[in-house]
A protein has these predicted regions:
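Rossmann-fold dinucleotide-binding core
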Residues: 1-33
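Helical "substrate-binding/catalytic lid" subdomain
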Residues: 20-121, 125-149
Length: 151
């Protein structure tokens, strides 16, 4: 399977038996979805409080709030040149796909008897984006949806 997987991403990691790859994918994507939602809220509040978001982004990146999302996928446009937010939210990963993956995570967790309140909150945000006609836009557009402004 390695030759097939080699073209799918930068790195292929063997995770065991059939089905484990899907399990790892939804566990990873739910974290990304929650991080994007949290980063969007944090940056939107920082903006409302009058903070320079480039400075806030730098502080978060060097502090305990740093994450892949803030390093490579910042939901506020103009901070990271190659992020979807800096390119009119042209999709890297759509709201529809994020809602689907977070939903699969929730279904799987429910089957295992695991509560998922953070995943539920994040999925609600992505579903709201879909309901507002933004299903085909990048999932980081929730920054604007919750009131953040891109100048």
């Amino acid at each position: 399977a390695k030759p097939i997987h080699a073209g799918m991403g930068r790195e292929s990691i063997h995770v065991g038996v059939a089905g484990n790859g899907q399990a790892a994918k939804i566990c990873n994507n739910v974290l990304t979805g929650i991080h994007i939602a949290a980063a969007s809220e944090s940056l939107a509040l920082g903006q409302r409080l009058g903070l320079d978001l480039n400075v806030l982004h730098d502080i978060i990146g060097k502090g305990s709030g740093g994450s892949w999302v803030m390093e490579r996928y910042c939901p506020k446009g103009g901070i990271l040149e190659n992020a979807p937010s800096s390119n009119d939210y042209k999709p890297g990963f759509t709201n529809a796909l994020m809602a689907k993956d977070v939903g699969l995570f929730q279904q799987t967790a429910q089957t295992e008897g695991l509560p998922t309140p953070l995943a539920s909150a994040a999925r609600s945000m992505y579903q709201l984006a879909i309901n507002n006609g933004l299903g085909d836009r990048d999932c980081s557009i929730i920054f604007e949806m919750i009131g953040g402004k891109n100048d």
